């Protein structure tokens, strides 16, 4: 496909390429979407679970849902698209990955500079002392308590109605404005302020490579449109660039 070869050429000649990823890059790793069809949780709207109000009302119910999600994330493995971005960073082409995902698969694939705008489901944060811990297995006693102070732990993610970390968001916009190429993979771009990052990159002169099987917010704005899934893109681009994934 000519557009893939053109993407390879643009990336090879780039000075500061950045990736921006969403749920589509992890779907092929088996990460369930918010509105999964798995038994109990199909009856719940995520907005009734992923909010501070829901946690204050019924922390055990919220943790039961997150325990289910943690179990599936721990069982998942990075796919070729995650590994492609890690290899591009290894080669010096890619400078950072900015992700809306909370599954930690970019780091597990080997990416080092990863900005997790919405947090990480494998981390918990104490509501009392603020200390953090990482899950190696799903929590058993729900809601879990802080090993330091005994306070109630909450998932270290951004819930509906909560602001993103200001310093992290500023860093992400700084990277976007500095980039000369941005690869957008697997996101509709519907959720702001994260969805504004590719537009900020474009306004600063970056070339946008938009990888998504369906039209999205960046269709018509991007310089290169690749209507394909993340893994197919990774396979094609890695061949074009001679990268082993």
Curated annotation (Swiss-Prot):
Keyword vocabulary terms for this entry: Cytoplasm, Metal-binding, NAD, Transcription, Transcription regulation, Transferase, Zinc
GO cellular component, one term: cytoplasm
Cofactor(s) needed: Zn(2+)
Disulfide feature: none
Top EC group: transferase
Family annotation (Pfam families): SIR2
Domain of life of the native organism: Archaea
Purpose: NAD-dependent lysine deacetylase and desuccinylase that specifically removes acetyl and succinyl groups on target proteins. Modulates the activities of several proteins which are inactive in their acylated form. Deacetylates the N-terminal lysine residue of Alba, the major archaeal chromatin protein and that, in turn, increases Alba's DNA binding affinity, thereby repressing transcription.
Domain notes: 2 residues (Tyr-66 and Arg-69) present in a large hydrophobic pocket are probably involved in substrate specificity. They are important for desuccinylation activity, but dispensable for deacetylation activity.
Protein name as it appears in the record: NAD-dependent protein deacylase
Species assigned in the record: Aeropyrum pernix (strain ATCC 700893 / DSM 11879 / JCM 9820 / NBRC 100138 / K1)
Gene giving rise to this polypeptide: cobB
